[in-house]
Every structure is written in structure tokens, then in C-alpha cells.
């Protein structure tokens, strides 16, 4: 193999940086579906209840209350929506 052959192989193989630019940026479908589900009325209401209760609990200096129930309600509403939509988006 001569010097010319080596140079030809280097130019034909392409630059790895160019190949990376040509590839599409992959987007996680789970993230996309979660964002869509958070916009639904049921999730919006659950988030509003969570934020309202969080403000209530945070305003008190000494309290044993927490927002666990409201957090679980919000996550349940969002996950319920995601479960129905996610697999339709997979290839």
C-alpha cells in the first residue's frame, strides 16, 4: 500500500464530524408524550392542586403536613395518559 492509497482511503472514509451532523437528533418519545399529557385538563388540575397545597404547606413554619397525596395524584394522572399513548409512538 502506497502513500496515495492511504490518502485516498482517508478522504473516502469521510470525517466522523460530518457523519454526526448528518444523523438526526434522536428524541425520547417518553419525554414528548409526558409533555403532551401534562397539558391535558386532568393533569393540569392535578398540578394546580399540588402547587396550591405546596404553597399552603410551605407557608407554615412548623407542620407535619406534606404534599404526598397530591403528588401521587398528579403522577398517576400523567402516567395513566402516558400509558395509553406511548406505544403508539414507538416504531
Curated annotation (Swiss-Prot):
Location(s) in or outside the cell: Mitochondrion inner membrane
The organelle targeting sequence, given as a residue range: 1-13
Gene Ontology biological process terms in this record: mitochondrial electron transport, ubiquinol to cytochrome c
Region named Disordered: 1-30
Top-level lineage group: Eukaryota
Main location: mitochondrion
Keyword terms: Acetylation, Disulfide bond, Electron transport, Membrane, Mitochondrion, Mitochondrion inner membrane, Respiratory chain, Transit peptide, Transport
Function: May be a component of the ubiquinol-cytochrome c reductase complex (complex III or cytochrome b-c1 complex), which is part of the mitochondrial respiratory chain. This protein may mediate formation of the complex between cytochromes c and c1.
Subunit structure: The bc1 complex contains 11 subunits: 3 respiratory subunits (cytochrome b, cytochrome c1 and Rieske/UQCRFS1), 2 core proteins (UQCRC1/QCR1 and UQCRC2/QCR2) and 6 low-molecular weight proteins (UQCRH/QCR6, UQCRB/QCR7, UQCRQ/QCR8, UQCR10/QCR9, UQCR11/QCR10 and a cleavage product of Rieske/UQCRFS1).
UniProt protein name: Cytochrome b-c1 complex subunit 6-like, mitochondrial
Organism (species): Homo sapiens (Human)
Amino acid at each position: 500500500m502506497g502513500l496515495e492509497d492511504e490518502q485516498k482511503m482517508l478522504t473516502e472514509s469521510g470525517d466522523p464530524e460530518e457523519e454526526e451532523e448528518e444523523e438526526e437528533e434522536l428524541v425520547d418519545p417518553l419525554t414528548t408524550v409526558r409533555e403532551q399529557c401534562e397539558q391535558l385538563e386532568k393533569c393540569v388540575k392535578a398540578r394546580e392542586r399540588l402547587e396550591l397545597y405546596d404553597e399552603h404547606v410551605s407557608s407554615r413554619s412548623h407542620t407535619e403536613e406534606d404534599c404526598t397525596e397530591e403528588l401521587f395524584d398528579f403522577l398517576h394522572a400523567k402516567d395513566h395518559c402516558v400509558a395509553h399513548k406511548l406505544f403508539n409512538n414507538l416504531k
